[in-house]
Swiss-Prot record:
InterPro entries reported for this sequence: Ig-like_dom (IPR007110), Ig-like_dom_sf (IPR036179), Ig-like_fold (IPR013783), Ig/MHC_CS (IPR003006), Ig_C1-set (IPR003597), MHC_class-I_related (IPR050208), MHC_I-like_Ag-recog (IPR011161), MHC_I-like_Ag-recog_sf (IPR037055)
Family as reported in the entry's similarity comment: Belongs to the MHC class I family.
Disulfide bonds listed in the record: 122-185, 224-280
Keyword Repeat applies: no
SUPFAM superfamilies named among the record's database cross-references: Immunoglobulin (SSF48726), MHC antigen-recognition domain (SSF54452)
Protein name: H-2 class I histocompatibility antigen, Q8 alpha chain
A biological process from GO: antigen processing and presentation of peptide antigen via MHC class I
Leader peptide range in chain numbering: 1-21
PROSITE patterns, alphabetized: IG_LIKE, IG_MHC
Location in or out of the cell: Membrane
Organism for this UniProt entry: Mus musculus (Mouse)
Annotated spans, Alpha-3: 204-295
Regions annotated as coiled coil: none
Domain Ig-like C1-type: 206-294
Amino acid sequence: MALTMLLLLVAAALTLIETRAGPHSLRYFHTAVSWPGLVEPRFIIVGYVDDTQFVRFDSDAENPRMEPRARWMEQEGPEYWERETQKAKGHEESFRVSLRTAQRYYNQSKGGSHTLQWMYGCDVGSDERLLRGYLQFAYEGRDYIALNEDLKTWTAADMAAQITLHKWEQAGIAERDRAYLEGACVQSLRRYLQLRKETLLCTDPPKAHVTHHPRSYGAVTLRCWALGFYPADITLTWQLNGEELTQDMELVETRPAGDGTFQKWASVVVPLGKEQNYTCHVNHEGLPEPLTLRWEPPPSTVSNMANVAILVVLVAWPSLELWWIL
């Protein structure tokens, strides 16, 4: 059992996903947390296909439901989400009971902060057949009990976990878990991979615009935004009178928007009043042709630009700095 699951550390979860064997994986991470003053423990589920979070449940949400976190999961109908929500709420209740049980096993008071975590899933090969299944529990961030690789026996981390091990052996829990991991887990992963494959055939073009951000000393930042595009591969460049400004451009990494699409921006610092000499160029496979954009000042700004330029020259330097901060 080489698992040290820390509360809601998604980066660690992704590291586990990327280093495990198998071309494709389905994993679920369940976490219940109690702390003083909390009426009921907070319960969170996140599900991953490979390195992509595709579902999430949070008991602290206004209307707790299993929700899609990947665009391709939006193809699932209301029946699927209702079924998954009911399963999540069932797991939530089981976790509350198990959290109290673990506190009793370790002779802990009810008033402290406690964490119970559960990770399970399956890996399939390129032929979509099972490579391995796994199921592990952690309590207070430390290993508690895990299903062994044979999917038939358990390893308990300490004496308290031995109590659980004996209970589960008598109840035949390993056989039930093995049936799920070898059956429904693999079938679900195959379905999700198919949904993702169908979505990969679609593209969403970026929605692009340029924003204007004043700086000190008579300069401004022009930032070119590309939002809501899919897939993630995109090119943003700035040009001055037709020449690329690669060296003078700040470019951020492409980031997920949280709805299955992506966003990115690129910026340059330019002299005040010279903004129209700069163009942003956006290239993405969802576009029929690359976009070329300039900053478009509001009508009121255009009419007053000469007055603003004169004012900037006349004001004292401390006032200019204050105007920039505001």
